[in-house]
Amino acid sequence: MPTNAPSLTVAFGTGGSFTTVSQDYILSVNTRRGRVQQNVFLTAGTADVVLNNMSGNFDPSNTASPWYGVLIAGMQVRIQGNGITIFTGYLEDNVVNQGDYPTVSLTFVDGLAQMGKAIAPALATSQYQETAAARAARALDLADWPAGARSLTGTTTMLATAQGLSCLDMLEQCANVVGGRFYVSRTGVATLVPLANKFSRPTQLLFSDQGDAYSVGYDGIITNPGTDYVYNEATVFRGPGVLQYSAKYNASVTTYGLKSKKLDAPVSNTTSAANLALYAARKDADAVVLAEQIDFTAIGIGALATDFLETELNDLVQVKRLTYDGRSITINSVVEGMAQTITADNWRVSIFTSVVDPYTIAI
């Protein structure tokens, strides 16, 4: 791996017991978690690991391999930098290249894939009027997700459900109901956080093109004036046959025109539903300059490597930018997703962000 970059470790395992893969075999690692922008549906994180297979050890049909019987669908992976976990997941695909330079390409997915494949069986009648945290726990139970790998917070009560949808869809509803987010952490913990969580997240990194103290320099940035992300009308869809709630922020409509969105959010309490609609109509109603994507190289960043490696989805970062005409702009951002490409001579990172909105309301 590159000099002055974090020390990369890839380990395969079963049942929570891991064995480290020798550095000599690792050709490249690509990970992606989260999403590239806010207000998009949950998708599974992925990790693509390419290994030198001249030894034949990573051919799953090689009965003499120490990995024989282990290198199968569902095998666990743990990827770390400086001993800090940056991805955990399960083997989904294995492509063996038997050419002049034999390689094996392994594709891993995180827990969202397991939740997306699991279906909550339809019920004859709607049942389980419960909090968002309890509903999320029910969905995770149906997906056979381990009880010890959960962190679920959400006290808003949801309407009874007839199920008949994927467990991931249920979890998306839970996140919508609490105005928060659901994700699987870099260490494999299924996490539901409510609206209030955004006010307690750490600011992990300062990115700057001006050489500020304790900052990480970036070499690429994509900014957006924010008009693409304006929404000023929101409808809370609580389900068929019940009253739906909508809200509109007229000042924004006057400036940008009507931009509407619908939340699949079966909120039980009508006051909570009305407040959720108000919040959803207001939080993205202003066009604010945002840093959609920040690109940098994780080489030679010293002690800040720990902060970078520990950065989690929904954490906060700051971006300082000096414009061509001499203005210094600071953008406060929330991490929506991350992608990393690690090779023998580089460690490239892209962080995808949205603007931290300052609004809150009781839901």
Report each predicted region and the residues it spans:
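N-terminal export/assembly leaders
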Residues: 116, 136-162
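Acidic, small/polar-enriched beta strand-loop surface segments
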Residues: 1-27, 127-129, 169-344, 351, ...
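Periplasmic POTRA and POTRA-like interaction domains that precede
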Residues: 124-141
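Assembly/oligomerization scaffold segments
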Residues: 1-127, 159-179, 184, 210-219, ...
